[in-house]
């Protein structure tokens, strides 16, 4: 008799995705981040569900309800900080996952890559709306500043912003709809993840060498299930260290002050994981230009497959591209630092140089390096 996991209509899908899936024998720890992102999403949905049971999306009570969760609900403080810091872990894994894709040329799987970009946008939108919900100072002013960027759209800008606000400023209507969207989006993300995996399993995983691994496959279970389990342990350990020892390390103290439309905080800045994009936005003195640069900072990922000039898929054996890649990583860290600094000399200049360098590396230097490396192959 054939094993039920191979015949049952539902178990068959699980079997082909997680058990009998043929996987390359040489994928490194950089391939762990996909499953870690799945774990992060599950943690966020679960903790978010329990938070939603006690949260009220009303301007008068939102801040108090979050305080109530932390003080009066059993382990409410744990759920709240797991959710807040879980978002940070989510973005760390996201950026590592995207970085791995760029380094090892995984972007040549076009459908998987493009769904991944849509997922990145969806997660960023969810995180932004989630940050508004506690209704602290940074929640309110962050929402005001970021939604206001849409007013840069020609002709329809102002109408568009007021339509999103549900009024003439960020108020009760805005908070209520942000809560609704923040609740529904993770489930849309989960559905997109299924599509992401569907496309990935059409081609199979890439591997560090970038060479097709059809001749040497191993079953996903037990080899990569145990490897993923180790990744889960490390992620949970790091998350708990953060939550139990310094839960407010990555947050903004201003968000412990209830939202006040009459008092603007001295430095309006988003959570750390958006600072690189925020720095790019601020480095352009024109509003529309800044918004376009902000969108392009992520959308540029969609252009990367078109700029792949190399005869090799992975950067494993391409030293010039490797150097450029790590300069890009350093540049993103620089942008993250600049995004958290006030708009004054010398930070303005550093931000502008880092922004130009970011786009130059991706759009100009990396394709050029690939062409040079192609020439070197013939020497």
From Swiss-Prot:
Pfam families per the UniProt record, alphabetical: Cytochrom_B_C (PF00032), Cytochrome_B (PF00033)
CDD domains cross-referenced by the UniProt entry: cytochrome_b_C (cd00290), Cytochrome_b_N (cd00284)
Main location: mitochondrion
Cofactor binding remark: Binds 2 heme b groups non-covalently.
Ranges annotated as spanning the membrane: 33-53, 77-98, 113-133, 178-198, 226-246, 288-308, 320-340, 347-367
UniProtKB keywords: Electron transport, Heme, Iron, Membrane, Metal-binding, Mitochondrion, Mitochondrion inner membrane, Respiratory chain, Transmembrane, Transmembrane helix, Transport, Ubiquinone
Cofactor(s) the protein needs: heme b
Binding, heme b b562: 83, 182
GO terms, molecular function: metal ion binding; ubiquinol-cytochrome-c reductase activity
Membrane topology: Multi-pass membrane protein
Positions contributing to a ubiquinone binding: 201
Biological processes, Gene Ontology terms: mitochondrial electron transport, ubiquinol to cytochrome c
Residues that bind heme b b566: 97, 196
Superkingdom field: Eukaryota
Gene3D superfamilies linked to this entry: Cytochrome Bc1 Complex, Chain C
GO CC aspect terms: mitochondrial inner membrane; respiratory chain complex III
Additional record remark: Heme 1 (or BL or b562) is low-potential and absorbs at about 562 nm, and heme 2 (or BH or b566) is high-potential and absorbs at about 566 nm.
Assembly with partners or alone: The cytochrome bc1 complex contains 11 subunits: 3 respiratory subunits (MT-CYB, CYC1 and UQCRFS1), 2 core proteins (UQCRC1 and UQCRC2) and 6 low-molecular weight proteins (UQCRH/QCR6, UQCRB/QCR7, UQCRQ/QCR8, UQCR10/QCR9, UQCR11/QCR10 and a cleavage product of UQCRFS1). This cytochrome bc1 complex then forms a dimer.
Similarity comment: Belongs to the cytochrome b family.
Protein's job: Component of the ubiquinol-cytochrome c reductase complex (complex III or cytochrome b-c1 complex) that is part of the mitochondrial respiratory chain. The b-c1 complex mediates electron transfer from ubiquinol to cytochrome c. Contributes to the generation of a proton gradient across the mitochondrial membrane that is then used for ATP synthesis.
PANTHER family named among the record's database cross-references: CYTOCHROME B (PTHR19271:SF16)
Designated name of the protein: Cytochrome b
